[in-house]
Structure formats: C-alpha cells, structure tokens
Amino acid sequence: QDPYVKEAENLKKYFNAGHSDVADNGTLFLGILKNWKEESDRKIMQSQIVSFYFKLFKNFKDDQSIQKSVETIKEDMNVKFFNSNKKKRDDFEKLTNYSVTDLNVQRKAIHELIQVMAELSPAVKTGKRKRSQMLFRGRRASQ
C-alpha cells in the first residue's frame, strides 16, 4: 500500500470527509477525469487538479496535526505527477503561485500573451512537415 493512502485517510478524518453530505452534488474531479481518455487531455486536467491540491495544502501549512500527512501526499504527487523532477515541480509551483490581482503580474502576462498564444497554436508544429514536402518536391523536379 502506498504511503499516501494512510495519510489521505488521516486527512479524511481531520476534514470529516467521510460524512454522507460530502457526496452531495457529485464529485469535484473524478467525473471530469472520466470524460478524458487521451493521455495529453488527462494531463491538462490533472495539472489543474494537482494545482488545486497544492493551494489547498498551502492553506494548512501551519496546522501541525496534519503536516506529516500533507507533506507525504505532496511528496507522492511529486513522484507520480512530476516524475520526481524537481525543476518541473518548482516551475509548476511558481506558475500556481502567481497572483492574478498583482498589477505587475497582470502587466507581464499581457505583455507575453501573443507569444504564449503562439506556443499554444498547433500550427507551430507543422513547419517540419512543410519542409519535408518541399525537399521531396525539389528532388523530384531535379530527376
């Protein structure tokens, strides 16, 4: 049994999360995860879910009675989601810690918006295919 299971059970007790009213109005995350089967789609959803948990855990960082549980689960998330890659985890936490109400963050985000949108565009990845087609046409024309 993974160490996080015992600690998650500990958190369930602490938050009284086993009570029947917790199931009211369905699940938060599990239904969404069921909707997505492709790995890349699931990773997008999982990143938002992991971000939520990191923010939740941050709210309880000073609560000594659950500190061990929170740290154990965060470490296990690091292994499972970030493949124990500290740089990836640090960058992820950096992104989740930006405050959308901070004027400097807002200004920088707007300044970078065009470049970020270009990175999101699948058209960026089609350049290689076009070159290959051009090379092929060039060879055929010279034969």
Curated annotation (Swiss-Prot):
It is found in: Secreted. Glycans are attached at N25, N97. The keyword Glycoprotein applies. Keywords: Antiviral defense, Cytokine, Glycoprotein, Growth regulation, Pyrrolidone carboxylic acid, Secreted. One of its GO terms (molecular function) is type II interferon receptor binding. GO terms for cellular component: extracellular space. GO terms for biological process: adaptive immune response; defense response to virus; humoral immune response; positive regulation of autophagy. The keyword Ion transport does not apply. The modification Pyrrolidone carboxylic acid is found at Q1. InterPro entries: 4_helix_cytokine-like_core, Interferon_gamma. It comes from the Eukaryota. Belongs to the type II (or gamma) interferon family. Homodimer. Interacts with IFNGR1 (via extracellular domain); this interaction promotes IFNGR1 dimerization. Type II interferon produced by immune cells such as T-cells and NK cells that plays crucial roles in antimicrobial, antiviral, and antitumor responses by activating effector immune cells and enhancing antigen presentation. Primarily signals through the JAK-STAT pathway after interaction with its receptor IFNGR1 to affect gene regulation. Upon IFNG binding, IFNGR1 intracellular domain opens out to allow association of downstream signaling components JAK2, JAK1 and STAT1, leading to STAT1 activation, nuclear translocation and transcription of IFNG-regulated genes. This is Interferon gamma.
